[in-house]
């Protein structure tokens, strides 16, 4: 048997796209994704959902995980006339895109993937770089008010001396179910 305790791209990318279009009013989204299997899956779901919402991406490009200079792709985002940038990248590239976008004055909302919600990713950025940035996440144990989730978060901090992320909560839930 296979157990999965973290929602897949079919779920989170639907929410990612809906938030951009329905909550932020995005009309011309750009998408930057990783060229890994992870990135391809997320990109496919973002494409499907943005198109279904009547807001297909005006620009989309994949990046290898090793890319450090994001200015070429960010320049293409700017040239496309995008009014928001949706990311489906790993942690390091997410931080690089956000930092370099802000440094070049690309002042559009950035709706990142779950990597941005990881405390380690946010710690790579200055608070000023995070202005106008949000992220989708399957869960947010550091934001929950539910007593059981708060107890998990407190125990996690005590055991690991760091903030729990959605992946930690998913693993915890998985072990509890077994």
Report each predicted region and the residues it spans.
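Extracellular/periplasmic periplasmic-binding protein-like sensory domains
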Residues: 98-172
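Extracellular/periplasmic Venus flytrap/periplasmic-binding protein
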Residues: 1-105, 141-151
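Non-catalytic, well-ordered alpha-helical segments in soluble enzyme domains
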Residues: 175-178
